[in-house]
A protein has these predicted regions:
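Long, hydrophobic, amphipathic alpha-helical segments used as structural scaffolds
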Residues: 112, 116, 169-173, 177
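Beta-strand elements of modular eukaryotic interaction domains
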Residues: 119-122, 164, 176-179
Length: 207
């Protein structure tokens, strides 16, 4: 596979974004005395670009590389559950699909990337599928992809994060990331298992 070129310093070195990949242990020990952790965006860019190149050298296809990045994202997603529970003195357990997706769009996204996800939509063809859209995801800003590998999307890492978070809070699903709108916007396709849809219908009927 042809290696991707990276530019971790494309953004200003002084620009920062909220990121909870680091310092989970510190928040577990001192949950209410520490400020929100922030990572310099250039540091994150350098680290993430190295992760992409490291995994690229150990796979033979883009599908395998996507799965490698998704696996790494899943580790973050599971830890986000613990982090947000520790930060919230009275955590609320969401039981409805729309509510948990709103929570991801707003709270989880802002905790990880310093902003809310751009929009959330439900598929018209099936009630089990939703789409979370992000215009120019942060992880895609630092990797230049060759034309012959234009389907590669670093946001597979973010898809793994969302999938693990949802599965960890009892909303089993599969999440895939793909590019739309001239390869700048990423859509995260969230497909819930039938058991989740059936539970949501029961809760709606018992309102």
């Amino acid at each position: 596979m042809r290696q991707f070129s990276t530019n971790p310093y494309r953004q200003s070195p002084n620009q920062k974004f909220a990121c909870s990949i680091a310092n989970f242990k510190l928040y577990t020990v001192f949950p209410f005395s520490l400020p929100s952790s922030q990572v310099n965006i250039s540091t994150f860019a350098f680290l993430f670009s190295e992760v992409v190149q490291y995994n690229q050298q150990r796979v033979t296809s883009l599908a395998q590389l996507h799965e490698k990045l998704a696996d790494l994202g899943r580790h973050v997603g599971f830890r986000m559950i613990d982090l947000l529970c520790v930060r919230d003195r009275a955590p609320k357990r969401e039981t409805r699909i729309v509510n948990i997706l709103w929570f991801i769009q707003k709270t989880v996204w802002k905790t990880l990337f310093g902003k809310e996800a751009d929009r959330l939509e439900q598929a018209t063809a099936t009630e089990a599928t939703y789409y979370l859209f992000e215009d120019e995801p942060l992880v895609n800003k630092f990797v230049s992809v060759p034309k012959e590998q234009s389907s590669f999307n670093c946001a597979a890492f973010m898809a793994g994060t969302v999938e693990a978070f949802l599965c960890g809070v009892q909303f089993p699903c599969r999440v895939k990331a793909f590019l739309v709108k001239e390869q700048t916007t990423t859509a995260f396709e969230i497909t819930f298992e039938d058991s989740v849809i059936e539970r949501d219908k029961r809760l709606e009927a018992n309102k």
